[in-house]
């Protein structure tokens, strides 16, 4: 989807005299959708951290909305799971009651995805039918809806990778793709909502607008790298900071031990974790420099205050990441780290969108 498609038009909606109310309603709906996506990411993170993601072995977009309702149905679902490599290698001897717990996490994650689909497309159709969306905004929203449908397919491709012979978890690259696409959809929702009927701030020079735009892009890259850390379980190794096995950067022989060399970026836990660390340092530096630039050139402005909030969130996220690493990824810390990443991305997207409206 192009940035032009995502950019809200300044043209008034078709409904005469309804622009303020309809735009406000659309904005509230978009922020509500963004909140649902955060909830989806949180439940997905809990599903992964509890080892529940492979408990449902089939993809049934319609009939799968109904969980097992009888003892016979539960026995059938459990039999399907017992045929998976994860059960055979990791969970042999699991009871039906234990299976029902992990099944509930994965079913809840999928059900929330279906709920988000209804919560998106039904209001979208209503707003469009009643003339409350101009063409550009409507097409941008439709594009996000298509990405949401694609996200469901990517989720199943990810799960299917973990059901292959010898696999006990999903492929890291596919988990990273699933998380990054969800994050991009979230950023798109926030971007659109932040630009609706908003009066421009004090004009910003091109330098500040570009650094504002860089922040959500860097955060998306960092989320993708975090997805690789989660998928490869790299957070369970090198549980020290700031050093990794006694060095700020481990020896290259260890970082590129896998052949071919390109696979180290996905399969070598040392390089995967190092990349996530270095990207975090880079993001923190850009956020700090951007705030300092605004503090010096636009002191007291709304842009400077937003940049300060972003810097605070990035700092908190870095502290959470370090805590999560030192504690070897407890459930609460892993979830807090994942949710805070979405908050950083959301704030950065709002700031970047407003900055693009504030041309000098």
UniProtKB/Swiss-Prot annotation:
EC identifiers of the protein: 1.17.99.9
One Pfam match: COX15-CtaA
Cofactor list: heme b
InterPro entries (alphabetical): COX15/CtaA_fam, HemeA_Synthase_type2
Binding site for heme: 276, 337
GO cellular component, as recorded: plasma membrane
Topology of the protein relative to the lipid bilayer: Multi-pass membrane protein
Chief localisation class: membrane
Reactions this protein catalyses: Fe(II)-heme o + 2 A + H2O = Fe(II)-heme a + 2 AH2
Membrane-spanning ranges: 29-49, 111-131, 139-159, 175-195, 210-230, 242-262, 269-289, 309-329, 330-350
PANTHER family: CYTOCHROME C OXIDASE ASSEMBLY PROTEIN COX15, CYTOCHROME C OXIDASE ASSEMBLY PROTEIN COX15 HOMOLOG
Name of the featured protein: Heme A synthase
Annotated source species: Methylobacterium nodulans (strain LMG 21967 / CNCM I-2342 / ORS 2060)
């Amino acid at each position: 989807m192009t940035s032009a498609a995502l950019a809200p038009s300044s043209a008034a909606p078709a409904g005469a005299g309804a622009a303020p109310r309809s735009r406000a309603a659309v904005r509230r709906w978009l922020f509500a959708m963004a909140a649902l996506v955060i909830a989806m990411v949180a439940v997905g993170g809990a599903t992964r951290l509890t080892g529940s993601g492979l408990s449902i072995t089939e993809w049934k977009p319609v009939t799968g909305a109904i969980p097992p309702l009888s003892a016979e149905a539960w026995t059938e679902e459990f039999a399907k799971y017992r045929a998976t490599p994860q059960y055979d290698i990791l969970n042999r001897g699991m009871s039906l009651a234990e299976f029902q717990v992990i099944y509930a996490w994965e079913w809840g994650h999928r059900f929330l995805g279906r709920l988000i689909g209804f919560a998106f497309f039904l209001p979208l159709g209503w707003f469009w039918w009643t003339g409350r969306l101009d063409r550009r905004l409507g097409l941008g929203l439709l594009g996000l809806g298509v990405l949401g449908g694609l996200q469901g397919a990517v989720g199943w491709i990810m799960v299917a990778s973990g059901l292959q012979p010898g696999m006990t978890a999903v492929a890291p690259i596919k988990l990273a793709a699933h998380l990054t696409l969800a994050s991009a959809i979230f950023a798109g929702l926030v971007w659109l909502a932040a630009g609706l009927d908003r009066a421009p701030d004090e004009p910003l020079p091109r330098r500040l607008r570009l650094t504002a735009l860089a922040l959500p892009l860097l955060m998306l890259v960092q989320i993708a790298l975090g997805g690789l850390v989660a998928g490869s379980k790299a957070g369970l190794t090198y549980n020290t900071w700031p050093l990794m096995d006694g060095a700020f950067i481990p020896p290259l022989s260890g970082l590129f031990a896998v052949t071919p060399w390109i696979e180290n970026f996905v399969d070598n836990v040392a390089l995967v974790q190092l990349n996530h660390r270095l990207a975090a340092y880079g993001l923190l530096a850009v956020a700090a420099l951007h705030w300092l630039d605004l503090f010096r050139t636009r002191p007291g402005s709304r842009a400077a205050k937003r940049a300060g909030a972003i810097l605070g969130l990035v700092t908190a996220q870095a502290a959470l990441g370090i805590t999560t690493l030192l504690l070897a990824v407890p459930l609460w810390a892993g979830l807090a780290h994942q949710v805070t990443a979405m908050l950083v991305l959301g704030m950065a997207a709002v700031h970047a969108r407003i900055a693009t409206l504030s041309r000098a």
